[in-house]
Amino acid sequence: MAREYSESAGSATDCETEGEFRNHSLVLPPAAAGLRLDQALARELPQYSRARLQGWIEAGAVKVDGRQMRGKDKVLGGEQVQIAARLEADDRVVAEAQPLAVVHQDRALFVINKPPGMVVHPGAGNPSHTLQNALLALDPKLALVPRAGLVHRLDKDTSGLLVVARTLEAHARLVAALGEREIERNYIAICTGVMTGGGTVDAPIGRHRAQRTRMAVRNDGREAVTHYRVAERYRAHTLVRVQLETGRTHQIRVHLAHIGYPIIGDPVYAGRRRLPAGCSPALTAALGAFPRQALHAARLALAHPTTGRSLEWEAPPPEDMARLIAVLEADQQQHERT
């Protein structure tokens, strides 16, 4: 059954305003029977986080057939739900102005080229100076959107493109598109070892059994699919182009290490450095000094969340990775001349 509800707030292209009321009227579908109230509402109103909906329920802003229910109460389907709630900013993460490379912006989204070394979300050991802090300084209204509008993430030392939703509606649509694998995310990586050709790694990923900060290929892990192809071969390394089909934690790093081609500089999965015979001093120095995993989110393609128009962006590798590629190419050319 199609969802039936009405909303008095602005369109998806309107920016949310703190303190603005959101009035919803909807009928829960028969398929909601047996679900908790908060679960049923999360399905019907995906533009809001479940935590926000639970807060509204606890505050008495949600009425079901004219009466108040608890979030854990089960629904039957067919109930009339009325919501009169005020949007409140999430003030747990503070705004901190930092330089950001904004590749694209419109009323619905930003596309950011994240530098290496920047953490995406605050957490243990990184309470501030993250991308989320910087986004809140760039646009304070992002405090009304879950995780300041961040739809996906990159590891701290991975550089490249990220999409950020500026409205609740855009966030819901982009999260749904990511779940349906409708957002294309392409990376470049420099791996140890010379690949003979491209391929696909289809291997589930889960938390490492002994080292909880690591991920590993595990039979009981979550589905993880990575496509890769050779872009350039060097004497002992390969430049590869990678496309994610799923988006598990450390997925590219784990999958490439799993097939025997770990990413240069990866402090967790790369193991010992391997140098080609007769390695030039320049290459030895470049490999020894490279400070991070050589992984960059180079291309992002998606349908705009409000217009549906197909959009794509590309970002060249940052300076440190570009220098390493240049040294690898020079080493290869020198070897071919001798």
Give the residues covered by each predicted segment:
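RNA pseudouridine synthases
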Residues: 1-338
